[in-house]
């Protein structure tokens, strides 16, 4: 593991370039090119990884090298696209300060997410081996569907940001509720699909009877939360597009501190197991839902102009 990390760290700067490039292109409503760039890099990694691990005999280090090569390729494509724009590359201090402020709020928000999910994994691990296995199966599906639903958030960021930047406040508000409706419908659809495969899909991940017995304790929370997640992720995108990161930071901290974290540790104290952990996640999502809906109903988020 240590040797893998040492090699993989060389890819960290290129990952940051790729993330920045994705943000830039999404911000100007260009979604096809970043998809191609990332797919090309990941496709190359998928080809190189088995070749370097097995025929080349590099083992775990081979997979790290494949990842770094993919990250370099993706970052290079974004650099090439940037240079083709023929724009000045000289830093603008005022813009950097604004971005650092926005980044600070988003970093704090991300840390709150990580504190919650690390705590949940810790409590699941202390419950039983079967419980932590079941938790990880359902959590991986939750993360996968979060990325699927996040496609709405990406669209919302681009369109709301463009509308407010052009001074079209009414258009931004109208789209906010439109994308919320799409998120709700999408979430309901995903919930129904995963409710239908509840007896089949977990067996794809494990055949362990103990883990399979624990999975239903989290599964139905996961299914029921999909409509909530659809709305929450859509409104996340709306407010991010409006540059309302400070509110998102505060709402996430409040939801984590009042809902998720207390319930997780109460679950450990009283032996509630996965039911307690996923009740905590449910409270977290419901609190986020309430705060985001109230914020979007207000007029405070829809500030027109190039900057807030």
Region roles according to the model:
Residues 1-13, 44-47, 51-107, 160-225, ...:
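Short alpha-helical transmembrane segments in multi-pass integral membrane proteins
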Residues 12-20, 24, 28, 39-47, ...:
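Hydrophobic alpha-helical transmembrane bundles that constitute the permease/transmembrane domains
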Residues 15-34, 132-197, 232-243, 247:
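Small-residue-rich hydrophobic transmembrane alpha-helices
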Residues 26, 53-55, 91, 124-127, ...:
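Structural motif
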Residues 30-31, 59, 128-129, 208, ...:
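Short loop-to-helix capping motifs
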Residues 33-37, 62-66, 250-251, 279:
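Hydrophobic alpha-helical membrane segments of integral membrane proteins
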Residues 51-58, 111-144, 162, 200-209:
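Helix-terminus/linker motif at the lipid-water interface of multi-pass membrane proteins
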Residues 235-239, 243-257, 264-272, 276:
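C-terminal structured "cap/appendage" subdomains that terminate the fold
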């Amino acid at each position: 593991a240590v040797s893998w990390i040492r090699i993989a760290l060389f890819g960290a700067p290129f990952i940051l370039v790729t993330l920045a490039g994705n943000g830039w292109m999404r911000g100007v409503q260009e979604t096809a090119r970043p998809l191609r760039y990332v797919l090309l890099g990941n496709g190359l990694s998928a080809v190189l990884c088995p070749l370097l691990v097995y025929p080349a005999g590099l083992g775990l280090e081979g997979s790290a090298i494949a990842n770094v090569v993919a990250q370099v390729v993706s970052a290079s494509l974004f650099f090439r696209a940037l240079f083709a724009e023929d724009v000045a590359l000289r830093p603008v201090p005022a813009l950097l300060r604004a971005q650092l402020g926005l980044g600070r709020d988003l970093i704090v928000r991300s840390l709150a997410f990580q504190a919650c999910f690390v705590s949940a994994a810790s409590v699941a691990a202390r419950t039983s081996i079967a419980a932590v296995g079941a938790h990880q199966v359902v959590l991986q599906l939750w993360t996968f569907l979060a990325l699927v639903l996040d496609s709405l958030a990406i669209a919302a960021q681009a369109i709301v940001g463009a509308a407010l930047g052009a001074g079209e406040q009414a258009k931004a508000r109208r789209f906010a509720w439109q994308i919320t409706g799409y998120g709700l419908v999408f979430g309901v659809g995903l919930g129904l699909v995963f409710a239908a495969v509840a007896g089949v899909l977990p067996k794809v991940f494990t055949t362990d009877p103990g883990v399979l017995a624990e999975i239903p304790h989290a599964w139905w929370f996961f299914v029921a939360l999909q409509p909530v997640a659809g709305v929450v992720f859509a409104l996340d995108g709306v407010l991010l597009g409006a540059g309302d990161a400070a509110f998102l930071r505060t709402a996430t901290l409040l939801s984590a501190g009042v809902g998720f974290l207390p319930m997780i540790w109460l679950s450990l104290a009283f032996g509630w197991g996965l039911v307690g952990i996923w009740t905590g996640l449910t409270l977290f999502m419901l609190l986020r839902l309430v705060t985001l809906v109230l914020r979007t109903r207000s007029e405070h988020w829809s500030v027109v102009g190039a900057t807030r």
